[in-house]
């Protein structure tokens, strides 16, 4: 367990077994990676255990099934655990949806929603409250996606983009371009579907790519917005990113987004980005097993660790450059310019500060949007996620 004496003994035994003494280079065992796990970003990222360079600060205690810490600008991966493990992404997949569709429509464009636009939204979806017959700007629809994780807003934008099927095809193509090879897209909203998976590495790629777009960056950093309620009326929506708003957990200084997610199957997943001292870090945490706040607390702890380690610890891998941005004929999985390769100096050590549970018990609580009367009814509320143990389906 991270921080436990047992993990210390594991690393010590491994070192003794190899006869390498205190300078040993070992990797803590972890859950087996998916059979199709890729080593995009460096050989060490294909391993299932904790990957961190020797001499790095002590890692915090963590319960996530997979996580990753990376420098947004250099692409250096500072530490990871099961980086390529394929897991259900929940609404964090909306980052790929936004990265794919957001550049296609001007934010001031207006769309009058039809019933057909709202067809096929899964029961139990998180909703912002889009109504057929009401006109919305593209900006308002994206606010519904980023702030409230509204699947109704996602489906309207997908309809504008040629339909759900076409949007899924484009998202998969974009994932391929980003070299997010662990990701299989079934729906644009991230809702639970058989075979819909991503990884901590891929979600970090989506966030890194998305944050290059000023609109993407602005939406995920927005705390509140007024959303149309029909006619001239509006109601306020609040971002469900708790590290941004400070709802239920302490807000994180310097946080700039990006996206949280929850389903009853996927558990809690979050990719966050923060800037301090001119350095921007990305952290993805997938499926911690200890309550709905854990995903935020573990993200904050890893951000703190990353800012302490950046510039001091050698990277264990890299966020690769999109294929479309590489010179023609360049090999896939090329590191970013200036980024250290997976074989950089600094041997892996047993991260005795870190332990990982490997069960599928996840906590969560929130209000559930409802389907009724042949239409979509969204509950106006200050926060979809609220403490108290009430089960939620997606957020």
Regions found by a protein language model. Give the residues of each.
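Active-site-adjacent loops and short helices of periplasmic peptidoglycan-processing enzymes
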Residues: 2-11, 18-201, 205-210, 214
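Penicillin-recognizing serine hydrolase domain
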Residues: 2-10, 34-62, 166-343, 358
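Compositionally biased, intrinsically disordered low-complexity segments
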Residues: 13, 21, 29, 352, ...
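Hydrophobic alpha-helical segments, especially transmembrane helices
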Residues: 13-14, 95, 276, 381-383
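A signal for specific C-terminal beta-sheet/loop modules enriched in small/flexible residues
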Residues: 88-97, 101, 295-309, 395
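Conserved SxxK-family serine transpeptidase/carboxypeptidase catalytic domain
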Residues: 309-395
């Amino acid at each position: 367990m991270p921080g436990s004496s047992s993990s210390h003994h594991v690393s010590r035994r491994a070192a003794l077994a190899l006869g390498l003494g205190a300078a040993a280079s070992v990797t803590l065992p972890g859950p087996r990676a998916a059979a199709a796990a890729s080593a995009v970003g460096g050989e060490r990222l294909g391993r299932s255990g904790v990957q961190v360079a020797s001499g790095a600060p002590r890692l915090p205690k963590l319960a996530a099934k997979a996580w990753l810490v990376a420098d947004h600008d250099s692409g250096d991966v500072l530490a990871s655990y099961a980086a390529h493990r394929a897991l259900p992404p929940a609404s964090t997949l909306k980052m790929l949806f936004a990265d794919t569709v957001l550049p296609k429509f001007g934010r001031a464009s207006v769309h009058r929603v039809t019933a057909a636009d709202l067809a096929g939204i899964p029961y139990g979806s998180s909703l912002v409250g889009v109504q057929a017959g009401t006109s919305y700007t593209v900006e308002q629809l994206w606010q519904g996606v980023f702030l409230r994780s509204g699947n109704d807003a996602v489906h309207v934008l997908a309809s504008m983009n040629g339909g759900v099927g076409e949007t899924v095809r484009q998202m998969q193509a974009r994932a391929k371009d980003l070299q997010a090879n662990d990701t299989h897209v079934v729906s644009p909203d991230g809702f639970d579907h058989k075979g819909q998976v991503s990884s901590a590495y891929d979600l970090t790629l989506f966030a890194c790519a998305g944050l290059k777009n000023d609109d993407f960056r602005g939406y995920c950093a927005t705390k509140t917005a007024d959303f149309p309620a029909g006619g001239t009326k509006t109601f306020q929506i609040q971002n469900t990113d708790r590290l941004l708003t400070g709802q239920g957990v302490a807000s994180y200084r310097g946080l700039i987004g990006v996206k949280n997610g929850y389903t009853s199957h996927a558990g809690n997943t979050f990719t966050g980005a923060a800037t301090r001292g001119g350095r921007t870090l990305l952290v993805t945490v997938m499926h911690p097993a200890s309550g709905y706040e854990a995903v935020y607390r573990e993200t904050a702890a890893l951000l703190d660790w990353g800012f302490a380690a950046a510039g001091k610890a050698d990277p264990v891998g890299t966020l690769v450059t999109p294929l479309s941005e590489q010179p023609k004929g360049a090999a896939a999985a090329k590191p970013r310019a200036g980024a250290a390769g997976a074989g950089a100096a600094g041997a892996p050590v047993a991260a005795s500060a870190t332990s990982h549970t490997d069960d599928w018990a996840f906590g969560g609580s929130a209000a559930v949007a409802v389907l009724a009367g042949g239409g979509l009814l969204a509950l106006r509320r200050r926060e979809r996620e609220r403490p108290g143990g009430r089960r939620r389906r997606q957020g």
